[in-house]
């Protein structure tokens, strides 16, 4: 079992790094875990729609270059499927019983994900209709993946 979290941009704040490190340690009991950061595209503040698409395309190319062909890709999208923690556990477990053992979760940059990345996605996941900083989403995602494994194993977890 392998979980990859593929994300645009680097974590800078120590507190986010510490939270990620804690959940990486916990999750390692259930799965190999890798976090891959691709550089975000430098862009001016007030971009035209065309410039936004160009930024998303460049970031998307960087993301797709890191996705293994056999990996099940789960993109985080505002318009994705909203699940409970138990629902996420069932989704992962269902895919595992069908022989899928390599999962890549993709978190886009501040402008979202390019169409090419969305087209490569096997499942669109949403945690909320709200927008969150991608640094925070990394922590929320890794915690929920950890929680999903606890649920799948029938182990106690904090509700």
UniProtKB/Swiss-Prot annotation:
Endpoints of the signal sequence: none
Localisation per UniProt entry: Cytoplasm
Top-level lineage group: Bacteria
Keyword Cytoplasm in record: yes
Family: Belongs to the RNA methyltransferase RlmH family.
Lineage: Bacteria, Bacillati, Bacillota, Bacilli, Bacillales
GO molecular function, one term: rRNA (pseudouridine-N3-)-methyltransferase activity
Coiled-coil spans in chain: none
Record field: catalytic activity: pseudouridine(1915) in 23S rRNA + S-adenosyl-L-methionine = N(3)-methylpseudouridine(1915) in 23S rRNA + S-adenosyl-L-homocysteine + H(+)
Its EC number(s): 2.1.1.177
Keywords: Cytoplasm, Methyltransferase, rRNA processing, S-adenosyl-L-methionine, Transferase
InterPro entries per record: Alpha/beta_knot_MTases, RlmH-like, tRNA_m1G_MTases_N
GO CC terms of this entry: cytoplasm
Name listed for the protein in its UniProt record: Ribosomal RNA large subunit methyltransferase H
Organism: Staphylococcus saprophyticus subsp. saprophyticus (strain ATCC 15305 / DSM 20229 / NCIMB 8711 / NCTC 7292 / S-41)
UniProt main location, coarse: cytoplasm
Subunit structure and binding partners: Homodimer.
Gene3D superfamilies associated with the record: 3.40.1280.10
Family annotation (NCBIfam families): PRK00103.1-3 (NF000985), tRNA_RlmH_YbeA (TIGR00246)
């Amino acid at each position: 079992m392998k979980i990859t979290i593929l994300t645009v941009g680097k974590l800078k704040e120590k507190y986010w790094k510490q939270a990620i490190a804690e959940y990486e340690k916990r999750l390692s009991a259930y799965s190999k875990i890798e976090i891959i950061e691709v550089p975000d595209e430098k862009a001016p503040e007030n971009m035209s729609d065309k410039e936004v698409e160009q930024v998303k395309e460049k970031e998307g190319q960087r993301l797709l270059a890191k996705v293994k062909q056999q990996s099940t890709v789960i993109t985080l999208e505002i318009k994705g499927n909203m699940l409970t923690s138990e629902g996420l556990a069932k989704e992962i477990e269902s895919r595992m019983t069908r022989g899928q053992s390599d999962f890549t979760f993709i978190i886009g940059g501040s402008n979202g994900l390019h169409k090419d990345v969305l087209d490569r996605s096997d499942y669109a996941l949403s945690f909320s209709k709200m927008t969150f900083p991608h640094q925070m989403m990394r922590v929320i995602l890794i915690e929920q993946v950890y929680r999903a494994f606890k649920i799948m194993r029938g182990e106690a977890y904090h509700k």
